[in-house]
Amino acid sequence: MKKYQCIVCGWIYDEAEGWPQDGIAPGTKWEDIPDDWTCPDCGVSKVDFEMIEV
């Protein structure tokens, strides 16, 4: 599973953990998250995230 980091605020989306607070189940791949989803911390869109190596 991959991780994606917001380039604005640094918040990290981990595919393995999902984001249940927004209804995104653990194991949800980045490409399966709706395009209108926004960063929970700063509100930017998915285009402002980059895949990171951890």
From Swiss-Prot:
Q: Which InterPro entries does UniProt cross-reference here?
A: Rubredoxin, Rubredoxin-like_dom, Rubredoxin_dom, Rubredoxin_ET, Rubredoxin_Fe_BS
According to its UniProt record, where is this protein located? Cytoplasm
Might you name a Gene Ontology BP term for this protein?
Answer: alkane catabolic process
Record GO cellular component, one term = cytoplasm
Query: Mind listing the UniProt keywords for this protein, alphabetically?
Result: Cytoplasm, Electron transport, Iron, Metal-binding, Transport
Domain Rubredoxin-like as annotated: residue spans = 1-54
In terms of CDD domains, this protein maps to: rubredoxin (cd00730)
Q: Which residues form the signal peptide?
A: none
What does the entry's cofactor note say about binding and number? Binds 1 Fe(3+) ion per subunit.
The Swiss-Prot or TrEMBL record annotates one GO molecular function as:
iron ion binding
Q: In which pathway does it act?
A: Hydrocarbon metabolism; alkane degradation
The UniProt record describes its induction as: Constitutively expressed.
- Gene3D superfamilies for this protein: 2.20.28.10
Instruction: Please list the cofactors this protein needs.
Output: Fe(3+)
Sites where the protein binds Fe cation: 6, 9, 39, 42
Q: Briefly state the protein's biological role.
A: Involved in the hydrocarbon hydroxylating system, which transfers electrons from NADH to rubredoxin reductase and then through rubredoxin to alkane 1 monooxygenase.
Question: Could you say which protein family the record assigns here?
Answer: Belongs to the rubredoxin family.
This protein is called what?
Rubredoxin
Name its species. Answer: Acinetobacter baylyi (strain ATCC 33305 / BD413 / ADP1)
- Which gene name does the record give? rubA
